[in-house]
A protein has these predicted regions:
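Sec-dependent N-terminal signal peptides
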Residues: 1-8
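N-terminal small/polar-rich segments of proteins
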Residues: 18-97, 123-170
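Terminal beta-strand-rich extracellular "head" domains
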Residues: 91-125
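C-terminal segment of classical bacterial N-terminal signal peptides
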Residues: 9-19
């Protein structure tokens, strides 16, 4: 009878619910951006007087040009900002007033010429809806005036500022 009881209990244990086994299974993927930001032309500050640095060609400056290549229309916004500070400079004891402008330049598709009129501006940043596939070049003018309106001379040395250009998925 003992053996019968053992078989009965063993049979019952097979019918009892088991603990569920679980595992986390990863799913991975890679997305390549279909919007690429490139520097077409590096900017250079001209120094037309002691208190101004400007990218304007009339003052021996070079306006930087950003090229954005888009292979998927209506998927990205371009956000481009002119500088509002130096990333490196001599020590400055007074304020710097910044002005600038971002504008659509050359385009690979004629309809892209509407980008400028349809863009929005927040401070130094201009946002463009990239509604067409192709290439757009953007110019980014920048002027820095030293002395808080008092026209104080910039100290001698090297100055560097950065244009921020990004593709943002819509």
């Amino acid at each position: 009878m003992t053996i019968g009881l053992i078989f009965a209990l063993a049979g019952c244990s097979l019918l009892m619910p088991k603990e569920a086994a679980a595992d986390n299974i990863d799913i991975t993927g890679t997305v390549q951006s279909r919007c690429i930001v490139n520097t077409d032309t590096a900017g250079v500050y001209g120094n037309p007087n002691a208190y101004t640095l400007t990218t304007l060609p009339a003052s021996n400056g070079q306006v930087p040009i950003v090229r954005i290549d888009v292979s998927l229309a209506n998927a990205y916004n371009a956000e481009i900002s002119y500088p509002t500070s130096f990333s490196s400079s001599p020590s400055l004891s007074d304020t710097v007033a910044w002005t600038g402008a971002v504008a659509t330049g050359q385009t690979s598709v004629s309809g892209m010429s509407a980008y400028q009129a349809a863009s929005t501006t927040t401070g130094a940043k201009r946002t463009y809806a990239l509604t067409l596939a192709g290439t757009t070049w953007f110019t980014v003018a920048s002027t820095a005036t030293y002395g808080g309106g008092g026209n104080k001379a910039f100290p001698g040395g090297s100055y560097k500022a950065v244009v921020l250009a990004e593709c943002i998925a819509q």
